Design a protein with these regions (language model features):
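Extended, solvent-exposed, turn-rich assembly/linker loops in the middle of proteins
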Residues: 16-87
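Sequence/fold signature of self-assembling virion shell proteins
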Residues: 70-191
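Generic secondary-structure boundary/loop-capping signal
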Residues: 9, 13, 61, 91, ...
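Long, contiguous amphipathic alpha-helices that act as assembly "spine/axial" helices in icosahedral shell
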Residues: 1-24, 46-56, 156-177
């Protein structure tokens, strides 16, 4: 699953309800309190206590490292955590919340998918995009769907590298969030 889906989850959530979108810049003094407070709000509104994960922008890792000493929260770094069958290494645990650090370029409120016709293609931050500092969601909330499209098979005549066949395929990915699960999503967005 792509972390670019963070923008899709944020956009969907912000269009329907803004109660779990906190506008704050994460610093050493407020990082732990902001994320813990948002998690508590999401847990209360969704009425589910376990199964959450936080995606945190990597540029805020230092704020959590510096704040780890002066808090009553249990913070540990370098854990291996299994989330939906995938094991992630070097995960920070904030109390019982696994926090996966992801590149800032993937944590934007608006993204633009470039077609590749008149530009280089790929995914870039959209116009007026804000940084998402943290995205909290229940592991069962976003439903990722993959579709195999445009299968091409190359025989020995086209494949000059060796005497055999080669297959090329294009995968399409999408993300769905059921309306009844929106209460289990929260975000901290840069002001």
């Amino acid at each position: 699953k792509s972390f670019y889906d963070a923008a899709a989850v944020f956009l969907l959530k912000s269009q329907i309800d803004s109660t779990h979108i906190v506008s704050a810049a994460l610093t050493k003094t407020n990082a732990i309190a902001t994320v813990s407070g948002l998690l508590q709000t999401v847990r209360d509104d969704a009425e589910e206590m376990d199964g959450y994960v936080a995606l945190i922008s990597h540029k805020h890792k230092t704020a959590f490292l510096e704040a780890a000493n002066g808090t009553y929260h249990d913070i540990s770094f370098g854990n291996a955590v299994s989330i939906n069958g995938v094991t992630y290494e070097n995960v920070m645990m904030l109390d019982d919340l696994p926090c996966v650090f992801v590149p800032q370029s993937r944590m934007k409120t608006v993204i633009t998918v470039q077609s590749g016709d008149s530009d280089q293609g790929g995914i870039v931050a959209g116009e007026n995009a804000k940084d998402i500092a943290c995205l909290i969601t229940h592991c069962e909330t976003p439903l990722a769907v993959s579709k195999l499209d445009a299968i091409k098979q190359f025989g020995p005549q086209e494949n000059q590298l060796f005497d055999g066949t080669s297959i090329q395929a294009r995968y399409l990915h999408d993300l769905f969030v059921p309306g009844k699960r929106l209460a289990s999503i929260g975000a901290v967005v840069a002001p």
